Every structure is written in C-alpha cells, then in structure tokens.
Amino acid sequence: MDMKFLDVLLPMMFEGLKLTVLIAVVGIGIGFLIGSLCGYLLQSKYKVGKAIAEVYIWIIRATPLMVQALYGYFVIPKLVSVDISSTIVGIGVIALNSGAFISEIVKGALMGIDPGQKEAGASLGLTSSQTMLHLIIPPAFKSALPALFNQFITSVKDTALLSAIAVNEITHQAQAYAALSFKAIPTYTALAVFYLIILSILIIVQKQIERKMR
C-alpha cells in the first residue's frame, strides 16, 4: 500500500486532535461542575433539586449523543434566534453528557464516605460546609478519580460523533480527506489506528493513576 497519503492525512488528523482535546477538556470540566452539583443533590434532602437532577439525567441518558448534537446545532439556534458555532454546541453536548454520568459517580463517592466523618466534623466544631469541604470532599474525590478519568476517555471517543454537525475534530478531518481523495479504506484504517494509539495512551495513564491510589 502506498503510504504517501499519510503525508496529507496525518497533519489533518493532528489538527483535528487539537480541537478534540479542547472540546473534551472544556466539556469534561463543565461537566464536572454540573455533575458535582447534581451528584450532591441526588443524595441530599432537597426534594426539588433532587427531582431536577433526576429529570436532567433521565433526558441525557435516554437520548443519543448524536441526536442531542443535531438538536443543539439545528434547532436551538432557531428557537433563540442566535447563531451558535458547531464547536460551542459540541462543548455543550459533551458537558451535558459527561455531567449526567459524573453526577452518578459523585453521588456514589459521597454515599461511600463513612458517616462518622460528619460526626467528626461536628466534634471539631466545624460547620456543615466546612465538614463537607475538609472531611468529605477530599476522600470522595480521591475515590471517584479513576471513574472520572474513565469518563474523560469516553468523552474523547464521543467527540467523533460531533462530525455529524461539522465539528472539525479528528473524524471529520478524516471524512473530508476520504471524500476528496476517494481513498476510504486506507483513510478510515489510519483513523482507527490513530484513535487506538491516542486512547491506549489515556488508558495507560488511567491504570497508572489507579495503581498509585491503591
């Protein structure tokens, strides 16, 4: 097989990688904030907040990410009469999706904390917020870290679906090259290998984190 096509395709995919990482990092960052709030509400006594979090999670988990992207790109801008770039829509979709799954991670991490931590905080004269900040959140975050990193890996993979709304991430760049060069087989083979390498690196990093936390 003539490998000269990689001279053009690889730079395109690396250019797409920049946007993929940007969308995944910003999306998971916003998703972490959303997920942390919803995760707290899910195990709290605030019935209204808990209900809102449950409805949000239900909607996100019961609809495909690609459908959400299409709705966000083609429908929402018309409803609000504002132009929204595909990149912003992509970040929003990744944020909302990761937030829904992170909320369950956070809920599990908080519920896994020894109830005695709250009693310890009270005995030390700490307020509820101080107890949460100093005695509950640190161990909860530590226990949730492997699952959070796994969600980041999932978000990186999910960015490939954003090619449906013309986000110039890795997959969209490969699709553009395949359409122009008529080299579908080598192009998509290279794309698969490219993702395999990138995600394998992230999986190795995740395993290292898990090993250090044992």
What are these regions (language model features)?
Residues M1-R214:
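Transmembrane alpha-helices and adjacent helix-loop boundaries
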